[in-house]
From Swiss-Prot:
Name this protein carries in UniProt: Eukaryotic translation initiation factor 6
Described function: Binds to the 60S ribosomal subunit and prevents its association with the 40S ribosomal subunit to form the 80S initiation complex in the cytoplasm. May also be involved in ribosome biogenesis.
Tagged with keyword Cytoplasm: yes
Keyword field: Cytoplasm, Initiation factor, Nucleus, Protein biosynthesis, Ribosome biogenesis
Record organism: Trypanosoma cruzi
Gene Ontology CC entries for this record: cytoplasm; nucleolus
Transmembrane domains' residue ranges: none
Amino acid sequence: GTTFRTSIAENALVGSYAVVNNKGCMVHPKTPAQDMDEIASLLQVPVVAGTINRGNAAIGSGLVVNDWAAFCGLNTTATEITVVERIFQLRRDLGGGRANLLQQLRDTLVDELA
């Protein structure tokens, strides 16, 4: 496998200052644009700088995300949630309302657990 050594906003603990899924990446708000471009190029996903939990720069301490859901701290603001939903592409028009959403979630879980 390939190993990439990097830092995020001059912090070596990249797991605390970045959260990534296969759709996007969110990093420490003081990450230089050049570093964000390098990360985007390495991972082949869009990268955005931001905070979580009402201004916390340690993104990894307050956000867990996968391909279809994100869990964040209770103090996370609406603006922060909007950024999370957009960069990780979590809001999709599923059509058919709540019943269809629940069915799709059930189908996904059953597929993964089968």
